[in-house]
Amino acid sequence: VHWTAEEKQLITGLWGKVNVADCGAEALARLLIVYPWTQRFFASFGNLSSPTAISGNPMVRAHGKKVLTSFGDAVKNLDNIKNTFSQLSELHCDKLHVDPENFRLLGDILIIVLAAHFTKDFTPDCQAAWQKLVRVVAHALARKYH
């Protein structure tokens, strides 16, 4: 994947403003609420019975932070995303059996969360760069499935 200097700047510039705990928790909660079938991968998280329960669930918050923290690894390694996510791809494929489509859904939700949090900064050019990034990350995570 080739990144232009402008794309790299748009991604890293916005990432520097992201509150990983809050945005991660919101993104994962939205995934579980908007796409309820994804909840089956989180049965051990306890009460996911309503949007309020999901949003207030400490395990959802913690895992959302973990997910977005690892997304930060992509931002730090834009030129080597495939290798950055090779172990996570293996885990999600071989052990957790997560449908790779869920990575794309989470990426789309992350775009929505970023747009909501950073209305001024999230220009169309910024969105295009982030859309490319979430697509590349989703593809890297789905790699072990092929």
UniProtKB/Swiss-Prot annotation:
Keyword Amino-acid biosynthesis: no
A Gene Ontology molecular function term of the record: organic acid binding
Residue ranges of every copy of the Globin domain listed in the record: 2-146
Binding positions (heme b): H63, H92
Keyword terms: Heme, Iron, Metal-binding, Oxygen transport, Transport
Pfam families, per the entry: Globin (PF00042)
GO BP terms in the entry: hydrogen peroxide catabolic process
InterPro entries assigned: Globin (IPR000971), Globin-like_sf (IPR009050), Globin/Proto (IPR012292), Hemoglobin_b (IPR002337), Hemoglobin_oxygen_transport (IPR050056)
Expression tissues: Red blood cells.
GO cellular component: blood microparticle; haptoglobin-hemoglobin complex; hemoglobin complex
Task performed by this protein: Involved in oxygen transport from the lung to the various peripheral tissues.
Similarity section: Belongs to the globin family.
Protein name: Hemoglobin subunit beta
Species of provenance: Chloephaga melanoptera
Lineage of origin: Eukaryota, Metazoa, Chordata, Craniata, Vertebrata
